[in-house]
């Protein structure tokens, strides 16, 4: 891939990372930048997973590097601390694009070699006139729009809406996708193991995703050294790398947790073996195979699933049957494995997107040679993705980051409380040196020792009784009718979870408009708060407990 194209790709990705203003899931902050901020600046809240040792500090440590450098140089301004992780994420996305291009270029080379062989066979076996006809046909095909798998795959990657929408966020899933792509390109066993170990340290499920590739390396080793020696080399090398990677991760995690913990095992046991992640939402088994695959790959998924047909009908395409079927196999294996887990999110199968787009590019190149309709369909699909990037990246659910931008650009606030559902907004990493104390509705999970199930949290109380929660938390009173048995039960439930007067009145409060309407008379106006600004969150809301508008209220000082 030429350097000028890499530079343009990085600029494009950096533009998206710096300008996209919408939110998807709290993990984009609370499992990355907020943990990194806590490591470097010693301030902020750590989600409950870090109390149970379910996460390795490896990924946040990478994010913490630019924070540490800024602090060391004394350049840790509000804007710099916010912008630095976006540069890092743009680099990760660019490397994914480069990997997509390189894997597509490998297919180009195999196809070009096979087509030359077929052309030579044709010239030797056919008449001169027919040979001339074939040369004209090849020449025309090279002047087509989609004549290179590598460039077509890069175009699909750059224009894919979910790659732009999700890829700009500091998820472990995104860097996991990069490591998986790099692993797929390894022909030597040791680099393959090291990259697999690194990916598994960030997300332990990567080990399952990449496990089929071990058999490929096993086959190569037995072919080269014989079955016994080859198997011995594979197992011995694997054990050495496994001990080295796990040892390094354990030492790094010990420095953070202050105790020995095997985070990949704890994560796998909690989320997969015990399936406790189901308490965060459940979906049917076909969720990934059906709506998610179509949603994240977009309409180009039609070309992806057509790849086996092209391999079967096109003689020259059989030269790339192994890598294409391999990518389809890894994608299907990934979707199948994640489908066994009840808790499902679209970003969990992010790695499937680049594999699907490379396969779609292969089909596009082969079909566009003989069908103008395919070229027009591709243009229409790319246009659809561009529209989706705008809607999902700049319109839908943008309220929380607009609030953060307002705080970054405004005066210093001593105490800011976010009265909304669990982790609605990011923390100090988005408003460095602008807020002395950030408060929010606590949703830290505490597992019951007897049942092993999560206990009721403040967040659940807030969802059930938003007005009473605010009154009880700040003023130590509620409006339940204690003479009514059901109302009395609700009051007891609230009092058992939320401490009365557990938080002082903040200088500013952020909440949805619906919550503001409920507490405006009994709390906001009573304590001298006025509406500072209303932010458009989304033209429509699909998620529960969301609103079209988010409001910021400030306390008027006399």
UniProtKB/Swiss-Prot annotation:
Segments passing through the bilayer: 53-73, 81-101, 164-184, 190-210, 234-254, 292-312, 323-343, 348-368, 372-392
GO annotation terms (biological process): GPI anchor biosynthetic process
Keyword Nucleotide-binding listed: no
Annotated signal peptide: none
Pathway given in the UniProt record: Glycolipid biosynthesis; glycosylphosphatidylinositol-anchor biosynthesis
Keywords: Endoplasmic reticulum, Glycoprotein, Glycosyltransferase, GPI-anchor biosynthesis, Membrane, Transferase, Transmembrane, Transmembrane helix
Top-level division of the source organism's lineage: Eukaryota
Cross-referenced Pfam families: Glyco_transf_22
Glycosylation sites: 220, 275
Topological category with respect to the lipid bilayer: Multi-pass membrane protein
Record flagged with keyword Nuclease: no
Function according to Swiss-Prot or TrEMBL: Mannosyltransferase involved in glycosylphosphatidylinositol-anchor biosynthesis. Transfers the third alpha-1,2-mannose to Man2-GlcN-acyl-PI during GPI precursor assembly.
Additional comment: The protozoan parasite evades the immune response of mammalian hosts and digestion in the gut of the insect vector by means of its coat proteins tethered to the cell surface via GPI-anchors. GPI10 is essential for growth of mammalian stage bloodstream form, while procyclic form (insect stage parasites) are viable but grow slower, suggesting that inhibition of GPI synthesis may be an effective chemotherapy against African trypanosomiasis.
Name of the protein described by the UniProt record: GPI mannosyltransferase 3
Taxonomic classification: Eukaryota, Discoba, Euglenozoa, Kinetoplastea, Metakinetoplastina
């Amino acid at each position: 891939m030429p350097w000028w194209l890499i530079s343009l790709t990085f600029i494009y990705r950096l533009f998206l990372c710096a300008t996209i203003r919408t939110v998807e899931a709290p993990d984009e902050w609370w499992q990355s930048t907020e943990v990194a901020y806590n490591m470097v600046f010693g301030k902020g809240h750590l989600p409950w997973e870090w109390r149970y040792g379910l996460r390795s500090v490896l990924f946040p440590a990478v994010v913490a590097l630019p924070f540490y450098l800024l602090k060391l140089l004394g350049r840790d301004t509000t804007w710099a601390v916010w912008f630095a992780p976006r540069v890092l994420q743009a680099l990760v996305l660019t490397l994914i694009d480069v990997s997509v291009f390189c894997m597509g270029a490998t297919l180009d080379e195999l196809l070009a070699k096979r087509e030359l062989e077929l052309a030579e066979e044709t010239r030797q076996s056919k008449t001169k006139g027919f040979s001339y006809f074939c040369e004209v046909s090849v020449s025309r095909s090279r002047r087509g729009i989609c004549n290179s798998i590598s460039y077509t795959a890069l175009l699909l990657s750059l224009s894919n809406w979910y790659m732009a929408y999700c890829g700009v966020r500091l998820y472990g899933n995104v860097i996991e996708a990069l490591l998986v792509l790099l692993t797929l390109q390894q022909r030597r066993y040791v680099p393959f193991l090291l990259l697999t170990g690194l990916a598994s340290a960030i997300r332990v499920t990567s080990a399952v995703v990449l496990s089929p590739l071990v058999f490929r390396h096993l086959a190569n080793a037995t072919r080269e050294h014989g079955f016994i020696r080859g198997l011995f080399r594979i197992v011995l090398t694997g054990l050495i790398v496994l001990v080295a990677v796990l040892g390094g991760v354990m030492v790094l995690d010990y420095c953070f947790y202050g105790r020995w913990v095997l985070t990949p095992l704890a994560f796998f046991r909690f989320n997969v073996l015990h399936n406790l992640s189901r308490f965060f939402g459940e979906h049917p088994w076909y969720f990934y195979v059906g709506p998610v695959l179509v949603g994240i790959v977009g309409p180009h998924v039609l070309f992806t699933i057509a790849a086996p047909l092209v391999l079967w009908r096109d003689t020259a395409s059989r030269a790339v049957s192994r890598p294409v079927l391999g990518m389809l196999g890894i994608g299907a294996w990934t979707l199948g494995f994640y489908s066994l887990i009840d808790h499902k999110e679209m970003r969990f199968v992010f790695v499937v997107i680049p594999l699907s787009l490379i396969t779609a590019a292969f089909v596009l190149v082969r079909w566009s040679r003989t069908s103008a309709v395919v070229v027009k369909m591709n243009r229409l699909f790319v246009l659809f993705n561009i529209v989706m990037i705008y809607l999902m990246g700049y319109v839908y659910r943008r309220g929380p980051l607009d609030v953060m931008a307002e705080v970054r650009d405004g005066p210093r606030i001593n105490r800011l409380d976010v009265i909304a559902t669990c982790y609605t907004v990011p923390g100090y990493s988005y408003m460095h040196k602008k807020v002395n104390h950030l408060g929010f509705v606590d949703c830290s999970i505490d597992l019951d020792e007897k049942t092993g199930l999560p206990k009721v949290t403040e967040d659940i109380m807030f969802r059930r009784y938003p007005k009473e929660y605010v009154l009880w938390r700040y003023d130590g009173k509620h409006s339940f009718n204690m003479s009514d048995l059901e109302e009395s039960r609700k009051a007891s439930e609230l009092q058992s979870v939320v401490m009365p007067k557990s938080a002082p009145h903040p200088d500013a409060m952020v909440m949805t408009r619906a919550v503001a309407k409920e507490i405006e008379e009994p709390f906001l106006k009573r304590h001298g708060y006025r509406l500072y600004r209303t932010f458009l969150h989304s033209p429509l809301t699909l998620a529960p407990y969301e609103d079209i508008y988010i409001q910021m209220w400030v306390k008027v000082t006399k």
